[in-house]
């Protein structure tokens, strides 16, 4: 399983994902910083990757992109890197078998909302 980290996700999360046995890459790896969310989705689709983001705008993509994409949105304020690592680690252990089809998933410190599409 592959994950594409949106540019707002700390690079340290890449290691958390890799330590759990999954592939992870960033927009920086593709030299594509600053691209629009639709292009991030296209990049993820072309690489069969799940988008991991802190940007709630990904929850409001047009319907066509939503039906194709796999998005994990992490709602965390303030953005504490230690808490973020714990949330991602817990998510990977809990959801890794459910991530094959299109979905939106919102994670917080205390709650999860999984929406298959």
Q: At which residue positions do the language-model features occur?
A:
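Charged phosphate-binding loop/patch that engages nucleotide di/tri-phosphates or the phosphate backbone
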Residues: 95-117
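Ribonuclease/tRNase effector modules and their secretory precursors
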Residues: 18-19, 89-94
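Hydrophobic/aromatic beta-strand patches that form the interior of the parallel beta-sheet core
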Residues: 25, 52, 72-74, 105-106
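Acidic, metal-binding active-site segment of PIN/NYN-like and related structure-specific nucleases
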Residues: 44-62
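N-terminal first-folded block
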Residues: 3-47
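Small/polar loops that bind or transfer phosphate-bearing groups
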Residues: 5, 53-54, 76
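Metal-dependent nucleic-acid phosphoesterase active-site entry motif
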Residues: 2-11, 109-111, 115-117
């Amino acid at each position: 399983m592959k994950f594409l980290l949106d540019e707002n996700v700390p690079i340290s999360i890449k290691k958390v994902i890799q330590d759990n046995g999954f592939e992870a890459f960033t927009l920086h790896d593709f030299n594509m910083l600053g691209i629009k969310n639709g292009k991030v989705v296209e990049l993820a689709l072309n690489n069969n990757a799940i988008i991991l983001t802190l940007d709630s705008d990904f929850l409001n993509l047009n319907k066509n992109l939503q039906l194709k994409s796999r998005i994990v949105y992490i709602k965390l304020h303030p953005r504490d890197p230690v808490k973020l690592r714990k949330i991602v680690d817990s998510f990977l252990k809990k959801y890794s078998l459910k991530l094959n089809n299109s979905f939106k998933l919102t994670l917080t410190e205390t709650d999860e909302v999984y929406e298959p599409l």
